[in-house]
């Protein structure tokens, strides 16, 4: 009898283990889970007729995302881990209390960990200044704004094991302090959003709801001084139809819909592009009853902003491309307004992937003195736009003031450089026109730094292409 029971138990276990594989015959998982991309079955033979020697590896990857009942199993596992251990089954999501979910990439900001250094914050300000000056020189008013992380505004539902903060210093505060007196147009969204008694972000999504987006939109439009409909008199529709991005990642088969608010803004404009959703990388709109032309960089927080801004401008262009090709977009769209929105957790992008702009040629106010140190240069075709040659590098062997600025002398012409954060430390970057400065050409490059108000030429250097 015991042997029969053991045999039945083994057979049951084998059957359970075979369900995901055999189930693919009748019910494979065809839709991606969360932010994953749709899995495609590999081919044993490549298009050129040669054998695909990576076929088995690719087949394994395909199976991992396509076995039967995968979403249901992920959802069940997530429910157990959240309910019993108050932890997340997905590395990119933090499971909080009362069914709240947070984006893991916001943890550093929440804890005050890995905060940008003073020189890095100054680099962000420096790069914003370059963007604003270029924008204004090409007829577009510039404004920068930051969308708060969800756990910045609503920390009470973060799990207990995030209770020990590393520091009370946060990038948002450092940025706001550094912006003071710079002349850079900045719209603060932290104060108005944090002053609201109502929760304006979704529980199971990392973003604000439409009511929060409307508040942000009105703050930006007021900062621009542009007349607009604030939707205070709009007939608002409340629908329980929104399933959050984090919810889809953690509970692909148990996503709970949340209430969202609709103000009718989406009926005031039409799409110029073949737009499938507000998630699209590039969206262009027209509203014949509005005036002005808007160019807006937005991340995923901008999804809910698109209807409001599209309704307020005659022509609007919304891009998610990063690094954004500001020069090409301004030349093509000729906007009168350029709004740049970044979420708090991505402030550092401004010094890791600054926008594509041709470096401004400049004249130094004094002849630079010599300064020791070693500059390492890299010259290469730009990875994102063929019209540019990228000249980047780092400086070592010398200590600079946290507000130091970089300039590159290339073939005896001086260009203002972006501040750049690299794995090797603080650095610099310029984009030069590739027709005048081809990457394969021998370029005479010198690094000049402005340190404590004085200009210095770095005497040591090496060149790599």
Segment roles from a protein language model:
Residues 1-465:
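Extracellular glycan-modifying ectodomains
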């Amino acid at each position: 009898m015991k042997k029969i029971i053991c045999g039945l138990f083994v057979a049951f276990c084998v059957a359970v283990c075979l369900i995901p594989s055999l189930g693919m015959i009748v019910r494979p998982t065809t839709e991606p889970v969360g932010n994953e991309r749709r899995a495609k079955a590999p081919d044993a033979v490549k298009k050129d007729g040669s054998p695909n020697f990576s076929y088995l590896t690719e087949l394994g990857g395909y199976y991992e995302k396509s076995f039967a009942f995968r979403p249901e199993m992920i959802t069940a596992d997530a429910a157990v881990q959240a309910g019993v251990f108050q932890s997340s089954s997905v590395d990119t999501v933090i499971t909080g209390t009362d069914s709240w979910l947070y984006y893991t990439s916001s943890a550093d900001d929440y804890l005050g960990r890995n905060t940008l250094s003073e020189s890095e914050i100054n680099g962000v300000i420096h790069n914003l200044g370059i963007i604003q000056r270029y924008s204004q020189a090409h007829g577009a008013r510039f404004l920068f704004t930051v969308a708060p992380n969800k756990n910045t505004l609503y920390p009470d539902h973060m799990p207990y094991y995030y209770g020990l903060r590393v520091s009370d210093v946060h990038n948002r505060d450092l940025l706001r302090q550094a912006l003071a007196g710079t002349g850079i147009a900045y719209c603060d969204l932290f104060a108005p959003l944090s002053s609201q008694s109502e929760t304006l972000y979704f529980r199971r999504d990392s973003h604000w709801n439409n009511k929060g987006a409307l508040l942000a939109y009105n703050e930006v439009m007021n900062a621009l001084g542009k007349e607009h409909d604030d939707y205070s008199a709009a007939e608002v529709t409340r629908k329980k139809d929104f399933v959050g991005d984090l919810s889809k990642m953690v509970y692909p088969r148990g996503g709970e819909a949340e209430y969202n608010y609709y103000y009718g803004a989406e009926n005031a404009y039409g799409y110029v592009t073949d737009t499938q959703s507000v998630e699209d990388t590039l969206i262009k709109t027209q509203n014949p009853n509005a005036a002005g032309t808007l160019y807006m960089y937005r991340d995923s927080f901008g999804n809910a902003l698109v209807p409001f801004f599209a309704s307020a401008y005659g022509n609007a262009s919304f891009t998610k491309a990063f690094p954004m090709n500001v020069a090409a977009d301004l030349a093509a769209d000729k906007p009168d307004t350029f709004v740049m929105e970044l979420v708090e957790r991505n402030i550092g992008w401004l010094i890791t992937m600054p926008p594509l702009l041709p470096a401004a040629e400049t004249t130094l106010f004094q002849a630079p003195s010599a300064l020791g140190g070693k500059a390492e240069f890299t010259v290469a075709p730009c990875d994102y736009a063929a019209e540019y040659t990228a000249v980047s590098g780092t400086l070592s062997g010398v200590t600079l003031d946290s507000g130091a600025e970089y300039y590159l002398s290339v073939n005896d012409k001086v260009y203002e450089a972006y501040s750049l954060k690299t794995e090797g430390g603080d650095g610099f970057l310029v984009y030069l026109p590739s027709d005048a400065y081809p990457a394969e050409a021998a370029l005479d490059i010198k690094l000049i730094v402005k340190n404590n108000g004085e200009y210095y030429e770095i005497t040591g250097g090496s060149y790599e292409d």
